[in-house]
Amino acid sequence: MQDLSLETRLAELESRLAFQEITIEELNVTVTAHEMEMAKLRDHLRLLTEKLKASQPSNIASQAEETPPPHY
């Protein structure tokens, strides 16, 4: 009776381990895909930011364009 219980418990543990290994592999694939997508989105955001900066003139005048401050 004791041997059957040990065999049953061992089979259950092996089954759980196999399920966990499959789950870990699936999660690894998902995380890798998300990392790749985030890298693409970061690149896209950087390009859009550069385009936006290039298309909008700055409201701050350069130092050469500024009028000199009054002297006291």
UniProtKB/Swiss-Prot annotation:
Chain residue ranges for the region called Disordered: 52-72
Residue spans of biased composition, Polar residues class: 55-65
InterPro entries: SlyX
Coiled coil: none
NCBIfam families noted in UniProt: PRK02793.1 (NF002750)
Family: Belongs to the SlyX family.
Protein name: Protein SlyX
Organism: Escherichia coli O139:H28 (strain E24377A / ETEC)
